[in-house]
Swiss-Prot record:
Any one GO cellular component localisation term in the record: transcription repressor complex
Region (Required for interaction with RELA): 140-257
Protein name: Zinc finger protein Gfi-1
Record localization: Nucleus
């Protein structure tokens, strides 16, 4: 291949190499900026100015040029022949000016006279991170989520006075500057911060124990499982939204009643259960069966049971039910399906509720207590039957002789022994 072709090819690809201005580049630039002479003096004002082509881009952002010597509307001494009305907004390119010098010819934003408000451009390298925070908008989808120490969701501003975070004492608020707090370590290291976790404890798998949370509203009937969350004594149910957000973030969790061992998926469900079942006040009683309730709405829902017809019949034994769910549970008896075994004796049950009632025999727990005589029972149905002794209510009556009974089993026995019916 001819050597001349190689030389031409090398010159054709010379744009890969960085260009450096020639020796007469600055001289030509000064001539363009100051046509009156090469020494930088202007023929109009006569003031001594520094050639603008030698200024760096950063200096143009932070330093405004001095235009006190020339009038804003004057185009005298410039390279353009346009009207002076648009002098401060646009300057046409010159054939003898390079692209680098063409940028320096354009006036800075401080020279734009028609704008009523002054514009101060920022040099981003000259500002600290704290000075730029007002330019960034924070995204806060949930106010309770940006306090998760183990998840790196802290927020710098303090919580509102009515926020659940204010329920924690000042000693925990001061501990938020530990390893899990912002500035005290990485986001992933919050779980190992110990006392530095201002609001939460260890969120790891090792914290899957039971943590009792005494409250004034529930009388110490709560227990939390799965996250090791701690709340101050007397905080009450105001931290329930906080616990719920944590449960959603960490992917699961359950809340167990320490009185009857019933498990709920949300703290609100546990609170309603404690208030209705273990608060000790059930002033609303059913006139048909004598069953008592803690709320009037629960009594109204229960009265619908007595008015409904038994439209769901079992095809095996002919027993009728008012709800399809009750019939489905009844069919487990005929299929002999017992999926719930007792952890103490191995006895199996059709329903989980029956298995829990059976475990009270082994543990000796009697969570249901009579408010009149103080007698305790392991099952709520036994407490309901016992309460009829104090009220004298007999909901089961014989249709042959009219005699009433407090229990259905007593009515069945009466029909068999006195009337010969089965």
């Amino acid at each position: 291949m001819p050597r001349s072709f190689l030389v031409k090819s090398k010159k054709a690809h010379s744009y890969h190499q960085p260009r450096s201005p020639g020796p007469d580049y600055s001289l030509r630039l000064e001539n363009v900026l100051a046509p009156g002479g090469a020494d930088g003096t202007s023929s109009a004002g006569g003031a001594q100015t520094e050639p603008r082509g030698r200024l760096s881009p950063e200096s143009q952002l932070t330093e405004a040029p001095d235009r006190s010597s020339a009038s804003p509307g004057s185009c005298e001494g410039s390279v353009c022949d346009r009207s002076s009305e648009f002098e401060d907004f646009w300057r046409p390119p010159s054939p003898s000016v390079s692209p680098a010098s063409e940028k320096s010819v354009c006036p800075s934003l401080d020279e734009a006279q028609p704008f009523p408000l002054p514009f101060k451009p920022y040099s981003w390298r000259g500002l600290a991170g704290s000075d730029l925070r007002h330019l960034v908008h924070s995204y806060r989808p949930c106010a309770a989520l940006d306090r998760g120490a183990g998840l790196g969701l802290f927020c710098e501003r303090a919580p509102e006075p009515g926020h659940p975070a204010a329920l924690y004492g000042p000693e925990r608020a001061a501990g938020g500057a530990g390893a899990g707090a912002p500035g005290g370590g990485s986001a992933g290291g919050g779980a190992a911060g110990g006392s530095g976790l201002g609001l939460y404890g260890d969120f790891g798998p090792a914290a899957a124990g039971l943590y009792e949370r005494p409250t004034a509203a529930a009388g110490g009937l709560y227990s939390e499982r799965g996250h090791g969350l701690h709340a101050d004594k007397g905080a009450g149910v105001k931290v329930e939204s906080e616990l719920l957000c944590t449960r959603l973030l960490l992917g699961g969790g359950s809340y167990k009643c320490i009185k009857c061992s019933k498990v709920f998926s949300t703290p609100h469900g546990l609170e309603v259960h404690v208030r209705r079942s273990h608060s000790g006040t059930r002033p609303f009683a059913c006139e048909m069966c004598g069953k008592t309730f803690g709320h009037a709405v629960s009594l109204e829902q229960h009265k619908a049971v007595h008015s409904q017809e038994r439209s769901f019949d079992c095809k095996i034994c002919g027993k009728s039910f008012k709800r399809s769910s009750t019939l489905s549970t009844h069919l487990l008896i005929h299929s002999d399906t017992r999926p719930y075994p007792c952890q103490y004796c191995g006895k199996r049950f059709h329903q989980k509720s029956d298995m829990k009632k059976h475990t009270f025999i082994h543990t000796g727990e009697k969570p249901h207590k009579c408010q009149v005589c103080g007698k305790a029972f392991s099952q709520s149905s036994n407490l309901i039957t016992h309460s009829r002794k104090h009220t004298g209510f007999k909901p089961f009556g014989c249709d042959l002789c009219g005699k009433g009974f407090q229990r259905k089993v007593d009515l069945r026995r009466h029909r068999e022994t006195q009337h010969g019916l089965k």
